[in-house]
């Protein structure tokens, strides 16, 4: 079946001649960096045209926020499958993994996941490259005498390699044994150092691990040290429940207030803010309303955005983001009229959205697209999504959703745009067919379900 990629509304397209599946190399790379499914469609039509870009994608993580959306390894793997000489791409990925050095990026996870896809297809060179890197990092951990006075990148790399390599119970037990031996032999190791691996794979192979722990002291040590960390975290959580406001400060306190605080508690923090005159301490008091909406007239907070104290300025802008009040909208519009077109000001407009602001909000988003300011565009998307949350009394700026789908650099946030487009019956067959190849697994599943 021939599939034409979904085309965004013409007024939001940078290239007015864009024709769906047929893209220039520049259009292709920009769409690929966002993880849009049209790139898979385009590669299948004209693989040689995009070969160098797909090869580039093999060598590095290019997800905007891999911690939230995952890497783009499946997405890259699917594009590579359009080429008959897969070994060329596997060798390039293996070479990048060999050259990789711990740096705190998500490159290692992208490279190792991509190689594992090919290893599962029977390419031994891909599996060998993974095993060699795992052995290299593990050997380095055993050679280390102390924990570094920085983020322990090597530990994170080892855990990520373990997650990728543990594809069945046998490989899981081998890696759990290696991690347990590290716990036994190295004093610098701390309980819960492999919490991600334990929670992800340990639950999957729990019974197998418990049985093996009775016979293998390394696996037993791994199980004990990870379980001890879970117990400690649960105890800490219970302590925080007893007197939450005594144990929480800043943004954490504000989140608790937004969901659980009674009116009397909120008023106490309002009073604490009002009575404070010293700018630095006033900023600290106002952090209680970073997430919890300020319940009274916000004019004092608006005035604090003009403070000479930068900390108080920033805290005031953050507090205004949660307030739906005519004076806040008027403040935002006045700022725009005076040339203040910042992401912080856009957030106030999004929270206080009314249909009359449709044109100016589109204009502000278009400015970010033209400047390729994707961080600000990403932030604007999150501000807009607040209007769609359950229980929100904000009118839905649904006309902005196609723009967010098209240009949001984060596939996790793009998923939100699609969810809200679905609620407003804005999804088309063309769009869903493109989503079948999206970099985001949840988007692909949603599209497949709706196209049945």
What are the roles of these predicted feature ranges?
Residues 6, 18-90:
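Charged, amphipathic alpha-helical stretches
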Residues 24-25, 50-61, 87-99, 124-143, ...:
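Amphipathic alpha-helical scaffolding segments comprising HEAT/armadillo-like alpha-solenoid repeats
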Residues 22-27, 430, 449-452:
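Terminal, non-catalytic domain-edge segments
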Residues 4-5, 10:
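Acidic, Ala/Val/Gly-enriched low-complexity intrinsically disordered segments
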Residues 80, 94-105:
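Post-signal peptide N-terminal segment of secreted/secretory-pathway proteins
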């Amino acid at each position: 079946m021939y599939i034409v990629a979904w085309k965004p509304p013409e007024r939001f397209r940078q290239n007015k001649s864009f024709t769906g599946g047929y893209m220039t190399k520049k259009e292709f790379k920009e769409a690929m960096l966002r993880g849009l499914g049209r790139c898979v469609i385009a590669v299948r039509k004209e693989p040689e045209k995009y070969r160098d870009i797909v090869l580039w994608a093999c060598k590095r993580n290019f997800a905007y926020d891999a911690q939230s959306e995952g890497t783009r390894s499946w997405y890259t793997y699917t594009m590579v499958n359009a080429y008959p000489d897969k070994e060329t791409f596997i060798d390039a990925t293996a070479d990048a993994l060999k050259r990789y050095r711990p740096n705190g990026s998500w490159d290692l996870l992208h490279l190792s996941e991509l190689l594992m896809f090919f290893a599962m297809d029977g390419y031994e060179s891909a599996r060998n490259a993974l095993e060699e890197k795992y052995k290299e990092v593990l050997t380095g951990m055993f050679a280390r005498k102390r924990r570094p006075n920085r983020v322990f990148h090597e530990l994170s790399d080892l855990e990520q390699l373990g997650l990728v390599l543990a594809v069945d119970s046998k490989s899981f037990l081998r890696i759990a044994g290696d991690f347990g031996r590290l716990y036994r032999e190295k004093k610098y190791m701390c309980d819960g150092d492999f919490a991600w691996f334990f929670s992800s794979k340990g639950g999957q192979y729990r019974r197998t691990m418990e049985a093996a722990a009775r016979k293998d002291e390394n696996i037993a040590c791994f199980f004990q040290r990870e379980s001890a960390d879970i117990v400690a975290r649960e105890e800490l959580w219970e302590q925080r429940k007893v007197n939450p406001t005594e144990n929480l400060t800043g943004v954490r306190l504000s989140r608790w207030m937004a969901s659980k605080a009674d009116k009397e508690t909120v008023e106490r923090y309002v009073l604490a803010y009002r009575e404070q005159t010293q700018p630095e301490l006033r900023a600290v008091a106002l952090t209680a309303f970073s997430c919890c909406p300020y319940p009274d007239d916000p004019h004092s907070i608006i005035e604090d955005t003009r403070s000479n104290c930068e900390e108080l300025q920033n805290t005031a802008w953050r507090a205004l983001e949660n307030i739906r009040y005519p004076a806040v909208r008027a403040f935002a519009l006045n700022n725009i009229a005076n040339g203040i077109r910042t992401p912080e000001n856009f957030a106030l407009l999004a929270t206080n959205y009314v249909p009359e602001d449709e044109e100016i909000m589109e204009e502000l988003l278009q400015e970010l697209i033209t400047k390729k300011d994707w961080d600000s565009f990403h932030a604007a998307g999150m501000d807009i999504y607040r209007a769609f949350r359950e229980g929100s009394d904000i009118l839905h700026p649904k006309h902005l959703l196609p723009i967010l789908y098209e240009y949001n650099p984060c596939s996790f946030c793009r998923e939100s745009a699609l969810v809200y487009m679905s609620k407003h019956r804005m999804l088309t067959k063309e769009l869903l067919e493109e989503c079948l190849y999206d970099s985001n697994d949840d988007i692909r599943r949603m599209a497949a379900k709706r196209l049945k």
